Amino acid sequence: MLFLLSPAKSLDFEKPAAPVPHTQPLFIPQAAELIDILKKKSPRQIASLMSLSDTLAGLNVARYQAWVPKFTAKNAKQAVLAFNGDVYEGLDAKSLPVDDLKWLQDHVCILSGLYGVLRPLDYMQPYRLEMGTKLANPQGKDLYQFWGAQISDYLNIRLHKNAAPVVVNLASQEYFRAVDRKALQARVLECVFQEYRGGQYKIISFYAKRARGLMARFAAEHRLSKPKQLEGFDAEGYAFDAAASEPDRLVFRRQQPLS
């Protein structure tokens, strides 16, 4: 099984990279092509394109200008340790032993507007480029057209040795849309996380994002290899609800968050 995650807007490049293994990103030429486009834009253009404040636009313009195609410990950090949003707080990779990080490296792919796909231990330089950004490029009007079938082709390569390939989608719709489903040669499982509120179960964004990270951590800690094993997920009070689930849509529910 291969697990897909979204990246995070929030980054942590203040703390030094941990003394754990690292790898180089897979799609550096493509990232460099996008950076070249972004480098030509002014802070005002970036603010408009990405709906950012002037401060954030200025920060990211500086990031684009500083970006180079050589990734080192001085300018980059392992992706799973650099991302700092709700998903990654749930995953809490910094507290995992190296063996678990290596398992994540072999079984998790982080989708990225700039880098296409990042393995957890791939070095990345700081950036802001959401997959839904309408950044015109030689391939089309947005990043979905830029990446085309490249991401699904890579996932197929990763899965080709599996007799029954399965992708567990823990990414958002915005990011999973970058995967060409027609080209993807795998069964796709969706995991849905719901909270009990006002007499009914519903998805609450903050908790759902955190739960995606918790599921990835659970998979690493328990070395999950079969879809049935996903049903054992019980972190922070969640439990599998068979009645609410479908074969390719697994629903996990809880009454209230654990304090």
Curated annotation (Swiss-Prot):
Coiled coil: none annotated. GO terms for biological process: response to hydroperoxide. InterPro entries: YaaA (IPR005583). It comes from the Bacteria. GO terms for cellular component: cytosol. It holds the Pfam family H2O2_YaaD. NCBIfam families: PRK02101.1-3 (NF002542). Belongs to the UPF0246 family. This is UPF0246 protein Rfer_2372. It comes from Albidiferax ferrireducens (strain ATCC BAA-621 / DSM 15236 / T118) (Rhodoferax ferrireducens).
